[in-house]
């Protein structure tokens, strides 16, 4: 999750129309696949409750998001080049509908402004992610990811292991991530418990 404000009013207007035509789903257990790679270009998924992770086909973790969230809103216009999986990280409720149906509903209800606002927000989130990761050294990537994690609420941080999340998001080797985390803990820069992030006192700009 990132600090950019989610366009909630636009989401609610989209949800009001899309939900009438969606097929509802509910996942009780963690790590259940909501959207398979084969479905990622053909369906729109709307998450109403819960937390989900978005994983690219090459196993890179794009991010973890809390409801409400829409995935695949633009696929009726342009298919994604890569395939993705949506994975439940908690109990999760939502619905799905085909990308072509989503496009027809947006057209019928003149929801182009709302769809545009949502897509722009998602693009800004991905741009911020790229800024944190691309062209930066391993420590800078780890530091940026820790700063992202500390913005999560306490319940979410208690679910997500720091080392695995950083490794999957950045592809920095586990040994390097473990070394940096150990040094930060030793220097009292961060506090962790059972592999979960508790707090950040401050993070040095260089390692």
UniProtKB/Swiss-Prot annotation:
Keywords: Stress response. GO terms for biological process: response to oxidative stress. The keyword Kinase does not apply. CDD domains: CAP_ED. One of its GO terms (molecular function) is DNA-binding transcription factor activity. It comes from the Bacteria. Transmembrane segments: none annotated. The keyword Transcription does not apply. Disruption phenotype: Deletion mutants display increased resistance to oxidative stress, increased catalase activity and increased survival in macrophage cells. Deletion results in the altered expression of 82 and 56 genes in log and stationary phase, respectively. GO terms for cellular component: cytosol. Pfam families: HTH_46. Belongs to the IprA family. Deletion of the N- or the C-terminal 10 amino acids abolishes activity, while a region that includes amino acids 56 to 80 is dispensable for activity. Contains a predicted HTH motif, which may bind DNA. Involved in oxidative stress resistance. This is Inhibitor of hydrogen peroxide resistance. It comes from Salmonella typhimurium (strain LT2 / SGSC1412 / ATCC 700720).
């Amino acid at each position: 999750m990132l600090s950019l404000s989610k366009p909630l009013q636009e989401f609610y207007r989209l949800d009001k129309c899309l939900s009438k035509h969606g097929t509802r789903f509910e996942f009780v257990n963690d790590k259940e696949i909501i959207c398979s790679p084969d479905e990622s270009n053909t369906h729109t998924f709307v998450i109403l409750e819960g937390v989900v992770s978005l994983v690219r086909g090459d196993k890179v973790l794009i991010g973890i998001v809390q409801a409400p969230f829409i995935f695949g809103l633009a696929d009726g216009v342009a298919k994604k080049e890569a395939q993705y999986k949506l994975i439940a990280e908690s109990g999760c409720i939502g619905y799905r509908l085909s990308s072509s149906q989503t496009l027809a509903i947006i057209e019928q209800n003149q929801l182009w402004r709302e769809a545009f606002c949502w897509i722009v927000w998602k693009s800004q989130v991905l741009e911020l992610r790229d800024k944190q990761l691309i062209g930066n050294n391993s420590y800078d990537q780890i530091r940026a990811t820790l700063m992202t994690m500390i913005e999560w609420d306490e319940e979410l941080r208690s679910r997500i292991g720091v080392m695995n999340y950083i490794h999957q998001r950045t592809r920095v080797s586990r040994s390097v991530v473990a070394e940096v985390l150990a040094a930060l803990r030793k220097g009292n820069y961060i506090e962790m418990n059972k592999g979960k992030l508790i707090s950040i006192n401050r993070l040095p700009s260089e390692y």
